[in-house]
Amino acid sequence: MRRSTVRAAMKLTFLGAGAWGTALASHAAANHDVVLWGRDPAQLAAIAATGSNEAYLPGVPLSPRLRVEADFEQAVGHAADDPDGLVVVATPVSGLREMTRRLAGRGNGHVRMLWLCKGFEAGTHALPHQMVREELDAAGRTSGFDYGVLTGPSFAREVALGLPCALTVAGSVPTLADCAQAAFHHHAMRIYGSDDLTGVEVGGAVKNVLAIATGASDGLGLGLNARAALVTRGLAEMTRLGLALGGRAETFMGLAGVGDLILTATGDLSRNRKVGQQLAAGQSLDQILASLGHVAEGVRCAQAVAALAEACKIEMPITRAVCAVLFEGLSAADAVAQLLQRDARDE
């Protein structure tokens, strides 16, 4: 479906001043009235003073039109109180329930919310849209709250530098795609719509786990053939789980599936890939996470993906191998050896 992307300036609020939230906020600020909120007032003050987010995007200048706001209610009200506004939650998965709860509790005005996080919730193994729906039901918000996810192959630093990328938006209502395209589809960014919330979220979660596997393979010096095999067979694992959870096969052939997997599994800016490389070098998980300093979602959701695969009775041997290396003391080299010893079968 072709949609017009010519729109008047919108009001947007970003909740979360990490790398991705800051990069996308800076991109949107070129055309819109954008406010960025974060939990650390000192960090926000530094962004305002220097025009950059040195904690997450060092050396990258941000749009001079981007404004920061330390007061949560003031920041949310900027977009939520406008009938055409959009609130973008840029926290990790662990912060999504809190943000949804706080937005749902502001009254009965119409709210439009997108989130940027990828993964499953620890403990419940819920997808982000399931978490949001649970919070809205608990708050009695049966209408007037449109929600969705913006996802796809995108390194924050490249977006902040204005380099081209393409993303997918999937939402609870079709009009949310129009809203996201009006907000972000300009300059070097293209936004494509989808109605498969489950599929795009499964793709965004599983690719992080698979990127750890390809990073380990590369770290062991196993070559490009091995990398291609892991990406391809990993895509098969992603698709099997996605179908079992209610997603559609074609989604995994798009930006939120194979597109995001290729980027995260092969790009040197990928934190999850770096985890795999460092595991192959013999570092412990604690050492790796301390050196990264930022979230590597593949570590957080590997066990959830493996548990869901077991519950759905589907085979995900690469994912299972990643879990064994991360949490059970198996070396990366032994994990590869075990994968190579699996019985022959049809593709």
UniProtKB/Swiss-Prot annotation:
Catalytic residue positions: 207 (proton acceptor)
Cross-referenced InterPro entries: 6-PGluconate_DH-like_C_sf (IPR008927), 6PGD_dom2 (IPR013328), G3P_DH_NAD-dep (IPR006168), G3P_DH_NAD-dep_C (IPR006109), G3P_DH_NAD-dep_N (IPR011128), NAD(P)-bd_dom_sf (IPR036291)
Top-level taxon: Bacteria
PROSITE patterns, per the entry: NAD_G3PDH
Uppermost EC category: oxidoreductase
Documented EC number(s): 1.1.1.94
UniProt: NADPH binding residues: 20, 39, 118, 156, 271, 295, 297
Pfam families associated with the record: NAD_Gly3P_dh_C, NAD_Gly3P_dh_N
UniProt keyword NADP present: yes
Cellular compartments per GO CC: cytosol
Keyword terms: Cytoplasm, Lipid biosynthesis, Lipid metabolism, NAD, NADP, Nucleotide-binding, Oxidoreductase, Phospholipid biosynthesis, Phospholipid metabolism
Function: Catalyzes the reduction of the glycolytic intermediate dihydroxyacetone phosphate (DHAP) to sn-glycerol 3-phosphate (G3P), the key precursor for phospholipid synthesis.
Protein name: Glycerol-3-phosphate dehydrogenase [NAD(P)+]
Chain's gene name: gpsA
